[in-house]
Amino acid sequence: MTWATLIAFIVFVLLPTFYLISYVFLSWNDVRVEVFENPIIGDENWKQIQKVLFFSFRLSLSAVAFDLIFGIPLAYVLARKRFRGKDLLEDIVTLPLVMPTSGFGFATLITWTTVAGIGGFLGLSSGLVPLDTVIPIVNVPLMVFIVHVALTFPYIVRTLETKIQSIDTTFEMASRTLGATPLTTFRNVLLPLALPGIFSGSVLAFARSLGETGATLIVAGVSSTASIAIVRWTAEFKLATASFMGSLLVIIAWVLILPVEVYMGRRGKALRIPFHLPPSVLKGVMRVERYASRKLTRVKDFTPIVVLVLTVIVPILVVFNSVVLYWSADPYTGKVQGGVLYQLFGPSNYFNLLTKATLTSIIVALVSTYISMCIAIPLTFLIERKRYGVIIRSVLKIPLIIPTSSLGLSVLLLWGSNGFNLISSGIWLTILTHIVFSVPVVVESILAAYEGSDVQMYEDSARTLGATAYNAIETVSLPLVKGGILTGFILSFAHSLGETGATFIVMGRDITVPALVVNMVEALAIPAAFFTSTYLIALSLILLAIIRVTTRR
């Protein structure tokens, strides 16, 4: 069983994750000619890679900085305060993690740039902001920035919330008893202990932003991030350029995850920074903290919620409302051809495409999740019981944060005609791609349940009473972690159902629903895209409700 599990892990997860790097080395002559020494354009492709990477880094760093400003106060509120609606607020924070990004990207686009969104509600004749609006200084398109903030915000909030909940409140209470304001207590006591959580959340959010593809394809306009560039170059058969860019992103993901593993292992330890403010500056800071604690408490608590509502809730409500407005005809021209029903059941027959795409998405999600479960369950026990388990767990973090377009290209090169030549683009290659990132999702969910219960103690008791190792696992261990298994199944299914970037590269003619949304937007079938986005968001809400019910048990 051990060897079979390790072989499956290597073949289905490890090899596809890192094959792209080996492909670059094996095909270095092609990469060198296409990227650095092209006989026609010289090193123009290398310049494009640098330009795209620089833009992606600016975008990701800007989004993470914004997330930290508003995410830290919200994480503190969720971790330390009790109030009505707390569970609902946590669900809203979690929603972007399970929402198909292409549908969410389209909802955001409609909300801010068209008269069907906020602009129409305010009585404007156009959208609230033009699509080409750019944020000064960082020079990043506003729409892309909003989408990346919404999709990375949960990584900051949820990671830091968990870290704060694990910190004992004794020192905070002592600080408050001695007369320190809440902000001073946070700065001197809680912040040093929570810095590893802030650091790990920031790295995960940065990596998520760097690899985001589905929503960015919808709102990017003429801008191009690293993930979008890989999709575009693959479609143009510039495999050497795309693989070189993808390998750079894989290496970046690996470099980012190593410090996270180090600091996440510092349980209960503060990250000490050898820096002290001058006394005069410190007095000024404390005066500001006293004023803010008295006057700005409500602003501090409610501003992050406003950000969450504007970036997550409002786009969902707008796209739902748009389906109603456009149901039978275009509300502004009165033309039936501009209605949802006509585009779904008329000559374009998008309903038939949606039905086929739904069937494909469900098959891919179910099969990939089932295979992932078969690998992940025994792999979880190996991680907990073997010395090399910590290495496996660290490696499993890479597929979670690697840009999905890089992952899709790696799988295409590994199993396709440029590699083993076993599978061509289509549903089975999509399934193999989804297995790579589904296994870590399931493993992390089961590990959370395993580490939260005394599985080993109960299993040892069963072995003492005469049970075999297999019977002990079947009758004792698995029932104890069944909640984690079920949660992992749902999260994996939801992730697979909404994945866009990698799917675009490997799907061939077997289109999934998220990819269909992108195709609809590119074809200007906006009412059909309204309906399909609403359909995807509704599915994610149902899955989130199921997760909430299962985790409460």
Which sequence ranges carry the predicted segments?
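Membrane-water interface segments at the C-terminal ends of transmembrane alpha-helices
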Residues: M1-D30, D43-Q165, V189-A220, W233-A235, ...
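Short glycine/proline-centered loop/turn elements that form peptide/ligand docking sites
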Residues: I167-F171, L271-F275, D454-Y458
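Extracytoplasmic catalytic/substrate-binding loops of multi-pass membrane glycan-assembly enzymes
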Residues: S223-T225, D510-V513
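Membrane-interfacial, low-structure loops and terminal tails that flank and connect transmembrane helices
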Residues: L271-T297
